[in-house]
Amino acid sequence: MEKLKLLNERIVSRVNANLREFDFDTGQFINNAIEYDKLSKFYCFYGITSHHPIDFYFKHASMAGSYFLGKCAVNQSTIYKSDIRGDELKRKGDIMDRNNPLPLVEDETIVINSSLLYKTLVHSNSHNIETPEEFTIRNTVSSHYANIHGSTIEGCFLGSFSTIDLMNLHSCIVGEFSYVQAGEFFHKRIDPGVIHIENDDFSFQFKYEKAVIDKYIGVNASFQPRGLIYRFVTDKEPEYERLFKVVDLPPVQAPQSSAVNRYAVIKGDTRIGENVLISQGAYLENAHMGDGSNAQENTYIIHSYLVGMNITAHGGKIINSEIGQKTFVGFNSFLFGKQGAKVTVGKGCIVMPHTIIDSDCALQIPENHIIWGYIACKEDLITN
């Protein structure tokens, strides 16, 4: 136990050194989040498939309740109930940068050094052409349900339910419930509830009002999360713990063309169509998954009907809703329909990442629309 505490003190020291210009202390989060007696109660899991090289190295690390897939190297790190997925790691000989077409000299590896990842989803698919053989997370602390998607990170703090998507981040603080996909950032502090998407052809920026963030996913003085979305997720956690405790689970009824991960929760009258993907960590209850749909990691689809060819990206939550054909629901979106007040999204729509829809009356989003931000009534659809 003392060695674990010393390890976390070292991690705090490393991350704080990277963030010293912001006078930010990651120890406030770690000291209040980590319950050391629980770190010895959960196993670590390593997935083995015929498609991924078996290579798992760890040293001076705690990885309680976490799941790994693909080539991974973990050193001087604490990884708690996190999902480290290397299913899109590149292989030796692959070409990453078409403008500089040099093949990889060895298989890409996820490298995690001097970091603490707390209930974090890490998904490979790095776009960092400077380190093609390594998908790196160094000197970084990530909070509850943060999402690191295809992004290399060094010296950062990621707030609860934040998403870093397809970029490189250096010495940055990302506030809770923020989504950033903007190439590369150095030494920036991103406020809570910021949606920032930018490339050569497109720029989108939005910021939630503080009252909205406080209601759905605020944090206290020690950066511990609270709010409606956090309570919604934590209420479902016991269902996942059962998946890791029980060996012989009842089979899920699904066509042979569909894939349902063993570590997904499937409850109630859930129906799965052809060519459907249900990823690890997904939660389905009384859900209809139309042909060609998917529920990615950490998604929740409850009392909802997905017509078909639907994508629900990492962390998306769909409750009491109907989603039209070929509609995309982005990262960490929260579509909170009610009984008698359903959310209906027409076909061909895009629900932008980190969108919140929470209305006490039924809402209808027309076909082929893009929606974003906070939608609490029909009038909000005019501006969002």
Regions from the language model: what does each represent?
Residues 5-29, 33-34, 83-137, 141-144, ...:
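Glycine-rich hexapeptide-repeat left-handed beta-helix
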Residues 62, 73, 81, 136, ...:
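Ordered hydrophobic segments in well-structured contexts
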Residues 32-40, 69-74, 113, 259-262, ...:
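Short low-complexity stretches enriched in small and charged residues
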Residues 40-64, 68-69, 73-78, 83, ...:
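Extracellular beta-rich repeat passengers
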Residues 255-292, 296:
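Beta-propeller domains
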Residues 38-39, 44-45, 49-50, 55, ...:
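Short, flexible segments with low predicted structural confidence
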Residues 51-56, 239-268:
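Right-handed parallel beta-helix
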Residues 1-2:
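Sequence/structural signature of beta-propeller modules
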